[in-house]
UniProtKB/Swiss-Prot annotation:
Record organism: Polaromonas sp. (strain JS666 / ATCC BAA-500)
Protein name: 6,7-dimethyl-8-ribityllumazine synthase
Family: Belongs to the DMRL synthase family.
Keyword line: Riboflavin biosynthesis, Transferase
Gene: ribH
Enzyme Commission number(s) of this protein: 2.5.1.78
PANTHER family from the UniProt entry: 6,7-DIMETHYL-8-RIBITYLLUMAZINE SYNTHASE, 6,7-DIMETHYL-8-RIBITYLLUMAZINE SYNTHASE DMRL SYNTHASE LUMAZINE SYNTHASE
Length: 154
């Protein structure tokens, strides 16, 4: 979007991976679209449906708690965080965006586990809807690419 260059990588292969997805329900029409695009892309990358665990939580602030439980289970090669935070009239937007983003990053580092963060932060619903499909796909690709990389580095 907006001329950003994502770069390219070798063909991604997710056949051997187990992926956990945590979806926030808040702004559910957007997060449902994120989840659907993400799961379709995971399938296209070879991740079997039986190797995808998808759970829902109330909102973006609850996503890290579920991610942590998944990380501690040691069942997943990568995790994906899905959510949508739309700016309102109060400081709550910044609080939720900053705290959820920071927690997701901390978990990835603490557990040495790839976590693709697709918690959208937008000014309005139209911006979220414009990003919901591509960002869902991106999250799947990031998870599989990073799982492959960490597997290679181990």
């Amino acid at each position: 979007m907006f001329g950003a260059e994502k770069g390219s990588t070798d063909k991604l292969d997710g056949r051997k991976f187990s992926i956990g997805i945590v979806q926030a329900r808040f702004n559910e029409s957007v997060t449902n679209a994120l989840a659907e695009a993400c799961k379709q892309e995971l399938a296209a990358l070879g991740v079997e449906e039986k190797n995808i665990k998808h759970v829902k939580v109330p909102g973006a602030l609850e996503v890290p708690c579920a991610l942590q439980a998944m990380a501690e289970s040691d069942k997943y090669d990568a995790l994906i965080a899905l959510g949508c935070i739309i700016r309102g009239e109060t400081y709550h937007f910044e609080l939720v965006a900053n705290e959820s983003g920071s927690a997701v990053t901390r978990l990835a580092l603490d557990y040495q586990l790839p976590i693709a963060n697709a918690i959208l932060t937008t000014e309005n619903l139209a911006q979220a809807e414009a990003r919901q499909i591509e960002k869902g796909r991106d999250a799947a690709r990031v998870a599989v690419e990073m799982a492959n990389l960490l597997d290679e580095l181990a």
